[in-house]
UniProtKB/Swiss-Prot annotation:
Disulfide bond recorded as keyword: no
Enzymatic reactions: an alkane-alpha,omega-diamine + 2-oxoglutarate = an omega-aminoaldehyde + L-glutamate; putrescine + 2-oxoglutarate = 1-pyrroline + L-glutamate + H2O; cadaverine + 2-oxoglutarate = 5-aminopentanal + L-glutamate
Residues at which pyridoxal 5'-phosphate binds: G150, T151, Q274, T332
Top-level lineage group: Bacteria
Family indicated by similarity: Belongs to the class-III pyridoxal-phosphate-dependent aminotransferase family. Putrescine aminotransferase subfamily.
Known role: Catalyzes the aminotransferase reaction from putrescine to 2-oxoglutarate, leading to glutamate and 4-aminobutanal, which spontaneously cyclizes to form 1-pyrroline. This is the first step in one of two pathways for putrescine degradation, where putrescine is converted into 4-aminobutanoate (gamma-aminobutyrate or GABA) via 4-aminobutanal. Also functions as a cadaverine transaminase in a a L-lysine degradation pathway to succinate that proceeds via cadaverine, glutarate and L-2-hydroxyglutarate.
EC numbers for this chain: 2.6.1.82, 2.6.1.29
Cofactor: pyridoxal 5'-phosphate
Modified residues (N6-(pyridoxal phosphate)lysine): K300
Protein name: Putrescine aminotransferase
Class of the enzyme per the UniProt entry, highest EC level: transferase
Pathway(s) per entry: Amine and polyamine degradation; putrescine degradation; 4-aminobutanal from putrescine (transaminase route): step 1/1
Matching PANTHER family: AMINOTRANSFERASE CLASS III (PTHR11986), PUTRESCINE AMINOTRANSFERASE (PTHR11986:SF112)
Amino acid sequence: MNRLPSSASALACSAHALNLIEKRTLNHEEMKALNREVIDYFKEHVNPGFLEYRKSVTAGGDYGAVEWQAGSLNTLVDTQGQEFIDCLGGFGIFNVGHRNPVVVSAVQNQLAKQPLHSQELLDPLRAMLAKTLAALAPGKLKYSFFCNSGTESVEAALKLAKAYQSPRGKFTFIATSGAFHGKSLGALSATAKSTFRRPFMPLLPGFRHVPFGNIDAMSMAFSEGKKTGDEIAAVILEPIQGEGGVILPPQGYLTEVRKLCDEFGALMILDEVQTGMGRTGKMFACEHENVQPDILCLAKALGGGVMPIGATIATEEVFSVLFDNPFLHTTTFGGNPLACAAALATINVLLEQNLPAQAEQKGDTLLDGFRQLAREYPNLVHDARGKGMLMAIEFVDNETGYRFASEMFRQRVLVAGTLNNAKTTRIEPPLTLTIELCEQVLKSARNALAAMQVSVEEV
């Protein structure tokens, strides 16, 4: 039987939620009630699959942990008052920490004036953010399109490349195995994992996937396209594959891809949604090789962990295809004043506090520690790798990776696997993580592996 809509029920539910939003603290009974509600609502109205996922990576009934607030720049607090060191960083959102006061203040000040733009008049913060990114981005990147997520920034990049290259008779994209560019239809066509792709087949035509880091395979794809008349419009890739398991290509790979793009008249699209904004020790990961893309995709940390925002930055030559009709590709909320305020404040914090350099230094400390643990527990850990504060520990199998995440949760450190590689646990903390907390994370990882080793020996 169909359930009849109930405005009274919706009103009561929204009022209850608003009451919770107003509260800074909850008593014990309120916490227990909220946990029960959240679990029930996820099961009945969000997606029960999320609960099953939480059960698979936790133990002892901890799957129902409900986050409540930020504890500090680098920690989260759940409804039970337990504080967790955040080594997941919302998959790369919290580069400047949780509730960074500079970012929060900028958003609050803008909120007091004008939360959203009129859509008709010229909005100043969108102009100022575009100018700031043009000054910050490498090479000739000059014009920015703003959206709300990384997937949207990739969609915009693909459409820009199509609009630029279609008149030139070039329609095919090269992406790479292990790639993750998002899950909307266009971005998913570039993403490489069959689990995400298969239910939505057929995807957009015109995408080839070659092995990541293999410049010979990339060169062959270009040559074959030339021979068959199916010329390459653009290459899209991540400088470091995040969801693929934090996979670093050989040194010089990006440089060689850039050369191929220049040789064959293709555009180079770099997806820095996860690697950008200081994460790898440079503001943008492509700067490690001084490579200049034609189109650059940003999101995640651009909003400072306070507002969602994505950006697609392109050279004037490429972006000019939108000059005659700027309404060819737009979005209602993209570049809104609150999001732009957050992004401007985030860039200011990253530069003022030199957080990219801090990411390099602290990342070296953490990675050295993880590599030492890999040497001590070779039957559990296959590899530890990364750059800056984007790291991964690869385990011998999926189950071991899940067990490590569970043990770290017991140690009150939040980590998780990557979407394209379940054996790999991602370590992606805020760039503001202190040296003391870095040491605590390494201690917790040692304790977790020791507990896992005992379990293995008892079997």
